Amino acid sequence: MGSLANNIMVVGAVLAALVAGGSCGPPKVPPGPNITTNYNGKWLTARATWYGQPNGAGAPDNGGACGIKNVNLPPYSGMTACGNVPIFKDGKGCGSCYEVRCKEKPECSGNPVTVYITDMNYEPIAPYHFDLSGKAFGSLAKPGLNDKIRHCGIMDVEFRRVRCKYPAGQKIVFHIEKGCNPNYLAVLVKYVADDGDIVLMEIQDKLSAEWKPMKLSWGAIWRMDTAKALKGPFSIRLTSESGKKVIAKDVIPANWRPDAVYTSNVQFY
């Protein structure tokens, strides 16, 4: 009887542990507070992983949850990352820039590398989690140890938000998404300097002096749905996270078309 009682107690303890833990595997860590534009230079702690090809830009289509394509090419050049909830911020963190460094592993150089947020991750392994492209993760290493550091898998790192910098002359670019028409306009914004991310996009068409707010559709794509057909050219007014504004006057021409790219003559500098 004593043996049976002990067995019952053991089974009960196991069941209680399973209920308390919810599931097997590492415990889920709640996300930290949202990262803002407080450029105070303070380093915070995070965990870093990597995905995609060892020397690639992360996502297999060289894109990601921000909707930006060809992030393997300049000016992103594959130095990209998925941010977790307080970094990605449901798309409003798209385009923001961070310095990341590692110091604990012998392979770490200790020197910061700058990454652009172009994708998201929801893996609850730390309050702040960067899932870096293979190229960016390898760049944390001392010379010649890029492949070796990628074998670390998960790594403790330090990070801080920094102002985004682009090559001289790089202006803000708008991409009209496929499937758009005069009653539905979806616009991707990229190559935004300074804060890097946008909290408000407004549009002004030829028929009105009014600035109409667009809705954040997903990632870095903003949209306008209207019963009354829009008529170009369109001007776009952008507001960055720190409250700065720029106006791209008549950046989208009257004869605009879906899946077309239009380069403005403005930038946040």
Curated annotation (Swiss-Prot):
It is a peripheral membrane protein. The keyword Phosphoprotein does not apply. It is found in: Secreted, Cell wall; Membrane. Residues 63-169 form the Expansin-like EG45 domain. Its main location: secreted. Transmembrane segments: none annotated. The keyword Signal applies. GO terms for biological process: plant-type cell wall loosening; plant-type cell wall organization or biogenesis; sexual reproduction. SUPFAM superfamilies: Barwin-like endoglucanases, PHL pollen allergen. Disulfide bonds join 66-94, 97-164, 102-108. Residues 183-264 form the Expansin-like CBD domain. Residues 1-24 form the signal peptide. May aid fertilization by loosening the cell wall of the stigma and style, thereby facilitating penetration of the pollen tube. Acts selectively on grass cell walls, which are relatively poor in pectins and xyloglucans and rich in glucuronoarabinoxylans and (1-3),(1-4)-beta-D-glucans, when compared with cell walls of other angiosperms, including other monocots. Beta-expansin 1 extension activity grass cell wall is enhanced by dithiothreitol (DTT) and EDTA, inhibited by Cu(2+) and Hg(2+), and resistant to denaturation by methanol boiling and heat treatments. Belongs to the expansin family. Expansin B subfamily. This is Expansin-B1. It comes from Zea mays. The gene is EXPB1.
